[in-house]
Design a protein with these regions (language model features):
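Mid/C-terminal beta-alpha module of Rossmann-like enzyme folds, strongest
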Residues: 11, 16, 20-82, 119-122
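Residues at alpha-helix termini
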Residues: 60, 96-98
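Short, small-residue-biased leader/transition segments that mark boundaries at the very start
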Residues: 1-3, 51
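Residue-level detector of short coil/turn "hinge" positions at structural boundaries
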Residues: 66, 101-102
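Residues in well-ordered alpha-helical elements
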Residues: 19-22, 52, 92, 102, ...
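Amphipathic terminal alpha-helices
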Residues: 72-74, 86, 91-96, 103-123
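A short glycine-leucine-enriched loop at secondary-structure breakpoints
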Residues: 1, 98-99
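Short conserved motifs of the RecA-like P-loop NTPase core
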Residues: 6-9
């Protein structure tokens, strides 16, 4: 199975893994009301990575055969949309409240492989 990447390799995106999102929901539920003050909106911490950095991290974790499945086929329409998304957020309030980001893309990939019980060579 191949995956087509619809944006250019240098496209940056803000990332938070599904595991950290679920963790954030649970953490938010467990916070006392006073921790929120009058504003109950918070941007969650995350990391910024380019699509190239994500693919390179996948190669370091899953091997070159995983990278070989990626086909760079940028779609101008999709890229125009994605490039309007913010690439970085300042999240000091969220961090002070105890929310956390993934440390790096490799950790996100390793967690996904473990959570999905993916075995080497499985496609």
């Amino acid at each position: 199975m191949c995956s087509s990447d619809l944006v250019a390799p240098d496209t940056g995106v803000w990332l938070l893994s599904p595991a950290r999102v679920v963790e954030a929901f649970i953490h938010a539920l467990e916070l006392p009301a006073a921790a929120w003050g009058t504003n109950r909106v918070v941007n969650l911490p995350g990391i910024t990575a380019t699509v190239r950095e994500m693919v390179e991290a996948m190669g370091r974790v899953a091997g070159p055969e995983a990278v070989q499945r990626v086909r760079w086929k940028p779609d101008a329409r999709i890229e125009a949309i994605v490039r309007t998304w913010p690439v970085r957020f300042a999240t000091p309030r969220a961090q002070q409240m105890g929310f956390r980001a993934d440390p790096d893309v490799e950790s996100m990939i390793r967690d996904y492989i473990a959570d999905e019980n993916i075995k080497p060579g499985r496609r």
